[in-house]
Each structure stands twice: as structure tokens, then as C-alpha cells.
């Protein structure tokens, strides 16, 4: 897998809130409800480090269970009754669902980082050797090029993907000397032309990457942090 980092990319954010503790628990156990992409980072690094730090700080041993799904689906699950103690989602609108449901009892934006715990950018992942010669966003619209990104109906990452394509279209329009509504029309047209080449729209960013690794598609639009570890592993 190769990576193409292009101009006109949109920053991605991971947003976190601490939900009210559930009374009456017999053991000190926390449930993390998070969007799917940072699964390995949480399970291999962040959660073990938190458990060690908490033990050193308080002397208390805790256990952390985790649930990973597309950001929008995860938000609906928590509102619907999933008893999460911590929610890490990829869109502010998903977190606001928890706020409206009365599940967040403090101003989650009040900290120095405004609730944002990680950032990344949108990038393009291509097959080894880049056989379709993908160099820019226009290449995603060419006949015969199969594109992958998840469904914006369920995936927060997919919304960032689409916004990034739109932003690239805005930049293109301005570079061509367009102005006003013509720039917006150019950007919307780029989104439509890319969408026509989308082969599969999975429920989450992680599922989309898995589909790409199974040999489906020529190029994937996803988080850069999803691509870099795979490139290092020669995948």
C-alpha cells in the first residue's frame, strides 16, 4: 500500500467525553465506547497506560472494557442504553447527541484542548506501485478507477472524507479563476464525480480499510494514521 498526501486536506479530530459513573457497580470497571479507527491505539497503548497511571496515582486497580463502532452508530448506541463511562467519537454532532440526551453533565469543551484528543488528515491510499497512477483528486474521477470510503450515514470519518473532497474542489475552482457560486458548484461537481466511482461504502472507516486490504478498489480515502502503520508493515 502506498500513500498520496494531497493539498486541500481537512483535519480530523477525535473528541472525548466522560459520562456519569454508573452507581451500584460491584467492581471498578469502565466501558469505553469509541469510533472504530483508533482501536489498536486504545487497546495496545492508551488503555494500558491509563490503567498503570491510575494505579500509581490512586492505588486502585481498574479494568477497562471497550466497544468500537462507527461514530454515529456508537453515539446512537450510547443514547439508546449502552452504559458507557467514556465516549470517544469523531464528530462534534455525535457528541452533541449525548449532551441532548442528558448523558454529559459538564462542559466537555472547557479544557485547553477543547475536548480534542487526536488529530489526523485525510489521505489517499493506493496499491503498491500505484498502477492507476493516482496523483490527485481528479484521478479519482477517471473511468475504471474504483474508490473506497465509508458511508457518511454511519461513519464520522466518511463525513470528513466527503468534506475533504469538497474542499479540494473549492481549491481547484479558485485556482481556475472561478468565484462565488461557481466555486461551490465546481466543488459539488467534484464530489459527485468521485462518488460515481465509489465501489463500496462500508459502515465505518475501519471496515473500509479492511475491504481495501482484501483487494477491493484501486484507491481508498481515509485517515492518514490508518495508512502509515500499514505502509511500515509492507502491507
Residues covered by each model-derived region:
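Bacterial N-terminal signal peptides that target proteins for export
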Residues: 1-11
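A conserved helix-loop-strand patch within extracytoplasmic ligand-binding domains
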Residues: 99-172
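Ligand-binding pocket segment of bilobal, Venus flytrap-like solute-binding proteins
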Residues: 173-235
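Bacterial N-terminal signal peptides
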Residues: 9-20
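Stable alpha-helical elements in mature extracytoplasmic
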Residues: 34, 38, 42-46, 70, ...
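Short, solvent-exposed loop/turn segments at the edges of secondary structure
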Residues: 11, 90, 117-121
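Alpha-to-beta junction loops
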Residues: 81-87, 144-146, 214-222
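Early extracytoplasmic/lumenal segment of secretory-pathway proteins
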Residues: 26-101, 109-111, 223
Amino acid at each position: 500500500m502506498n500513500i498520496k498526501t494531497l493539498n486541500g486536506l481537512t483535519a480530523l479530530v477525535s473528541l472525548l467525553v466522560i459520562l456519569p459513573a454508573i452507581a451500584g457497580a460491584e467492581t471498578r470497571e469502565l466501558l469505553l465506547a469509541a469510533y472504530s479507527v483508533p482501536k489498536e491505539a486504545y487497546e495496545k497503548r492508551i488503555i494500558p497506560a491509563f490503567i498503570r497511571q491510575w494505579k500509581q496515582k490512586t492505588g486502585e486497580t481498574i479494568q477497562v472494557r471497550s466497544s468500537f463502532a462507527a461514530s454515529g452508530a456508537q453515539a446512537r448506541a450510547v443514547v439508546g442504553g449502552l452504559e458507557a463511562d467514556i465516549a470517544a467519537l469523531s464528530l462534534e454532532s455525535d457528541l452533541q447527541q449525548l449532551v441532548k440526551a442528558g448523558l454529559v453533565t459538564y462542559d466537555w469543551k472547557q479544557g485547553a484542548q477543547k475536548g480534542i484528543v487526536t488529530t489526523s488528515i485525510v489521505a489517499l491510499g493506493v496499491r503498491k506501485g500505484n498502477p492507476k497512477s493516482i496523483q490527485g483528486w481528479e484521478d479519482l474521477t477517471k473511468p475504471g478507477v474504483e474508490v473506497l470510503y465509508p458511508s457518511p450515514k454511519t461513519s464520522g470519518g466518511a463525513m470528513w472524507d466527503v468534506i475533504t473532497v469538497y474542499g479540494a474542489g473549492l481549491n481547484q475552482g479558485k485556482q481556475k479563476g472561478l468565484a462565488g457560486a461557481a466555486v461551490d458548484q465546481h466543488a459539488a461537481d467534484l464530489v459527485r464525480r468521485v462518488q460515481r466511482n465509489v465501489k463500496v461504502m462500508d459502515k465505518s472507516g475501519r471496515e473500509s480499510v479492511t475491504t481495501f486490504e482484501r483487494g477491493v478498489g484501486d484507491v481508498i480515502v481515509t485517515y492518514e494514521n490508518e495508512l502509515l502503520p500499514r505502509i511500515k508493515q509492507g502491507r
